[in-house]
Amino acid sequence: MNPTSTNERKVIITGIGGQGIVFLTRLFSQTALDLGLGVVVSETHGMSQRGGSVISHLKINGSDAPLIQRGSADVMIAMDPGEAMQNLDFMRRGGTVFVNSAEGLHESLAPHLERLDIRVLNHPATATAVELGSPAAANIVLAGFVAAFFILGLPYENMIQTLKQISKKGSE
C-alpha cells in the first residue's frame, strides 16, 4: 500500500485509561499528517481516569465524519483484550485486529471472527515492555508491531520520527 495513496483507513484504537490510547492516536495521526494525508480523530473517554474504556476513532484519508460506523473499521488496535471484545462490532468483514495479548481473543469468539473473516494478530506488548525495562511503553511496543505490517500505510521510519517529535523520552 502506497502511503500517499487515497486509500481510506478507518482505525479504532481502544484500551482502558492509563494505557496510552490518546498517545497512540496522536502517534498515528501525526505521522499521517506529516505524510500529507487527511486525518480525522474523535475520542471517547468513559471513566478513563479510573481505568474505564477509552476509544479513539482515527480516519486516514477518509470522510470528515468524526465517528467510525459500526461494521466499517478496517483495523482495531487494542491495548486490552477485553476492550477488543467489547468493540468488535466496529470491525468490517475482512478487517484486522491487533491485540496486546499473548493468547489473542477468547476462543468463544472464533466462530464470529471466522464468519466475518476478521484476522487477529496478537503480541504480548506489556510483557515485552516489562522485559525491556519500560512497562509504560507497552503502547509503543504495540505500535511497532502494527507498523511491521504496514497496514495503515505509515512507514516505520516516519513513525519513529514522529515518536521522537511528540515524546519527551523519544528525543533522549
Spell out what each predicted region is:
Residues 1-172:
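Active-site cofactor/cluster-binding pocket
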